[in-house]
A protein has these predicted regions:
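Conserved ABC ATPase signature
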Residues: 135-139, 143
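H-loop/switch region of ABC-family ATPase nucleotide-binding domains
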Residues: 196-197
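Catalytic Walker B motif of ABC-type/P-loop ATPase nucleotide-binding domains
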Residues: 160-163
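Conserved ABC ATPase "signature" region
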Residues: 113-130
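Hydrophobic anchor residue at the start of the ABC signature
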Residues: 149
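Conserved beta-strand-loop-alpha-helix hinge in the C-terminal portion
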Residues: 215-251
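Q-loop/switch helix immediately C-terminal to the Walker
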Residues: 90, 97-111
Length: 525
């Protein structure tokens, strides 16, 4: 079939009349229009607060903007999201995968299997970095940025959005990055939008230069009739001349308008009072989403499911395992020892122990395990998911066509729930072990059978207590998992949001435990 020349000439991105109003009524973008042609590199410059990040969110996080109360209106946004790729600040490499895994994930979801080493070589990196086990944490800033470029290229995206790609790079690496962008655009027929403050990068790559004006809140083309094109292949004198002119234009604009506050519209976005209650329902929506997506992800993407689940199991069970073992034994010993002393004079401790049996384990293990699990294990997973959002790894997943709900939420939810069930069982065993020490101290015979009877073979009048304990373990497991994933996976605009999410989850899950303890006690008693 012969390609349609008209289709090839159509803009990769065509935005007309874009207007974005913040929830407080400030107009951050007004009548923005931009078309990016095939093979073209467009650079967007602007000061802080000019709307560069907001424009990025319109392209990649439109639904999140709507949920946050932004008013986003455009006459036209023509864009094939299947062709749009993102290179976030500092690369946003997936830290739970090695270098090879980052590239393989992109290729799997693009249904384009290939050798990761080839893509590393294409961006000027040592192919040896594709060896299994090479951690992304060991890469320099320049290497990480190049791996991020290789990852998006391997996903076969045709329109690249590079968000401040030169942050943290020295001038030499900025020059290399500019050369890399131009080389890949030419070699693969790509288009690119580069958002930057770096005039060296801007001059090196731009076919056209735009300023997001703090005065008019729209794009204004710089040097429209004069700009000779990307400076990367130009003589140093010409390059230096245009870099100075570009820097002067940007500084002049910032000097005049840098402190300008965004204007407010007379018509604020409509109030949505139900948004206040949205966080309360989020854990239940996460549970429903995870239940729906987990079976499909497990069957179709077994490797990805196992990778994320293994990470969460390590955080929630394997690493804190010694802590749970020690604490449960100490609590088991302390509780039974105190019980043995409450009878007072004339009451033999061993008689009290035989009377209480393992009831203390049945009554206390679910709640104690839950509270400790939330504070230790739940906080670890909450922090990891939060850091994924904060460092834009979650956004990078979605930009590669990887549904972060299926890839992250579903396996994390399953692994967190199963980890709590395992921790609750371990906690019960630890409390029994502590009780065995007390029984040994008082020479209580058949101590194992005595302390485990209420769990393994309870008397008829105590069956309901064992059933209550089993029910609580089950309800705590999935309630905690839902809240941890919901709060960890919520948007994280700044670092403090990660710690707030952790604290909120501890509070919410503790209230969840207390409520179920009280409710079930009333039913059982």
């Amino acid at each position: 079939m012969t390609p349609d020349p008209a289709a090839d000439a159509a803009p990769r991105l065509d935005v007309r009349g874009l207007r974005v109003v913040l929830p407080d009524g400030r107009v951050v973008i007004e009548d923005l229009t931009l078309a990016v042609a095939p093979g073209e590199v467009v650079v967007l410059l602007g000061g802080s607060g000019a709307g560069k990040s907001t424009f990025s969110r319109v392209l990649f996080e439109r639904d999140e903007l709507d949920r946050a109360g932004f008013d986003v209106v455009a006459a036209q946004v023509a864009l094939d999201h299947g062709e749009l790729g993102l290179v976030p600040q500092r690369g946003a490499l997936f830290d739970h995968l090695d270098v090879r895994g980052n590239l393989e994930l992109a290729m799997r979801y693009a249904d384009a299997p290939d050798d990761p080493a080839r893509w590393l070589e294409r961006v000027g990196l040592d192919p040896a970095l594709a060896a299994p086990g090479t951690p992304v944490s060991g890469l320099s800033g320049g290497q990480a940025q190049r791996v991020a470029v290789a990852r998006v290229l391997a996903s076969r995206r045709r329109l690249l959005f590079l968000d401040e790609p030169s942050v943290g790079l020295d001038p030499q690496r900025v020059r290399r990055l500019a050369r890399l962008i131009r080389e890949q655009v030419r070699a693969l027929g790509l288009s690119a939008i580069v958002v930057t403050h770096d005039v060296a990068l801007a001059a090196g790559v731009a076919d056209r230069l735009f300023l997001l004006s703090l005065e008019h809140r729209r794009l204004e083309q710089l040097f429209a009739a004069e700009w000779p094109g990307p400076m990367e292949d130009r003589a140093d004198t010409e390059r230096g001349h245009w870099m100075l002119r570009l820097a002067e234009a940007l500084i002049s604009h910032l000097d005049e308008h840098g402190d300008r506050v965004a204007p407010r519209t007379a018509h604020r976005p409509p109030l949505r009072p139900w948004r206040v209650l949205e966080p309360l329902g989020r854990p239940f929506r996460v549970a429903g989403t995870a239940l729906a997506l987990a079976p499909r992800q497990l069957v179709r993407r077994t490797r990805d499911f196992a990778t994320v689940a293994a990470r969460v199991l390590a955080q929630t069970f394997l690493r804190p395992l010694p802590f749970y073992a020690i604490v449960s034994v100490l609590i088991g010993y302390t509780v039974l020892y105190v019980i043995s002393k409450v009878g007072g004079a004339g009451v033999r401790p061993d008689a009290l122990i035989r009377q209480i049996g393992g009831a203390y384990v049945v009554a206390l293990a679910p709640a104690l395990a839950a509270v400790l699990f939330v504070a230790a294990s739940g906080s670890a997973t909450n922090a990891w998911l939060g850091s994924m959002g904060l460092t834009r790894q979650t956004l990078a997943l979605d930009a590669l066509g990887v549904d972060s709900r299926a890839y992250l939420w579903a396996p994390a939810w399953v692994a967190c729930g199963l980890a709590f069930i395992a921790v609750a069982a371990l906690f019960a065993l630890g409390m029994i072990a502590g009780g065995l020490l007390v029984c040994r101290q008082y020479h209580v015979p058949h101590a194992w059978e005595l302390l485990t009877a209420d769990l393994l073979d309870p008397r008829p009048e105590r069956v309901r207590y064992a059933l209550r304990a089993g029910f609580l373990v089950w309800i705590y497991a999935w309630g905690i998992a839902s809240d941890v994933v919901a709060k960890g996976g919520a948007p994280k605009p700044e670092a403090d949001a990660v710690t707030r999410g952790m604290t909120a989850s501890v509070v919410a899950c503790t209230l969840w435990v207390v409520a179920w303890e009280l409710a079930t006690v009333l039913v059982v008693l």
